[in-house]
Amino acid sequence: PKATGIIVTDLMYKHWDEWVTTAPHPFVADFDGNAISNIVDILNGEPYESPMKPWGGIEQLAWNTTSDKVAYTCRKKTGLEYAISTNSDIYVYDLNTKKTENITEENKGYDTNPQYSPDGKYIAWQSMERDGYEADLNRLFIMNLETGEKRFVSKAFESNVDAFVWGADAKVIYFTGVWHGEVQIYALNLTDNSVRAITEGMYDYGVPALFGDKLIAKRHSISMGDEIYAISLDGKTTQLTQENKEIYDQLEMGKVEGRWMKTTDGKDMLTWVIYPPQFDPNKKYPTLLFCEGGPQSPVSQFWSYRWNFQIMAANDYIIVAPNRRGLPGFGVEWNEQISGDYGGQCMNCLLYTSPSPR
């Protein structure tokens, strides 16, 4: 029988679940309300991706406030150099002059996800410092578009800045970030670079959007999938969707608690413990030890469709999920300790620091 195949002569040949055969490009066009015209490929004739595969989306592109410039994320490399490098940059394409400017050329790690401020005076983006290090600290930078001055504004937050959105007055940026096993929404004051937590509790928040004097964001936890919430800037939350209420009303979830315990080298480590729905402290239960992969990804209040703790607990297991060494949310040193020590202290955290359920 006939067979097909792919001959690979260079990298990058595959991203997770897809072969690399095409490169997405950003286009701009005129729109009169009915149809588009004057279509322009910003990367015409170039072999580069924007948005970048495999995860990039529309968040890697941004219009300026006067709609005559487009900022985009791109790693302008090919072959082996592309495969091993994280050196992407923020480029600004001028629709009038057709010229492109690299505004992050001096930084050698990831630069991604540009956003212009509402007043048109600044541009913000996420930035990692080191080339080839995908788990580097994800920092927030802003640049004054008139002077070119750049500032690392999230220095007070010793963890990754995830999704972010400008405040209406361009004096505050709201962002999500993981800290101590929870992903909360924070307010970054650009006057003094101070950071204030807006939300709290055993939840993970995601993709905040500004709507008047409130934020709209999704929220989930170990015990509930995503729902949409309105968040006042003082932290008050209002649930807007109840997509799965009828299902949840029929279920009994297990108790979730966080415990701090000492590691073998004397550090404090947060561990999530999830109990069976009808836990009896007088009974003995088998325990499942959850070993987070990545390796540098957090054990937060995530709701997983693959590793769902509540489904495990519903089968009469106690789940132990340590935030072992080598993941974000506990400072840079904690996250980076695993580099060069994979199988060392992180395994000690998993195997020799197990709590006894009370």
Language model segments and positions:
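Catalytic nucleophile-loop/oxyanion-hole region of alpha/beta-hydrolase
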Residues: 331-348
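Conserved alpha/beta-hydrolase
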Residues: 316-329
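Blade-terminus and WD-like Trp-Asp/Gly-His loop motifs, strongest in beta-propeller folds
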Residues: 61-69, 114-122, 164-172, 208-213
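Short loop/turn segments that connect beta-strands within beta-propeller blades
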Residues: 31-34, 94-98, 145-148, 189-193, ...
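Non-catalytic accessory segments flanking enzyme active sites
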Residues: 3-8, 12-42, 59, 69-71, ...
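Conserved small/polar residues in nucleotide/adenosyl-binding loops
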Residues: 352-358
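Short beta-strand element of the alpha/beta-hydrolase
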Residues: 283-293
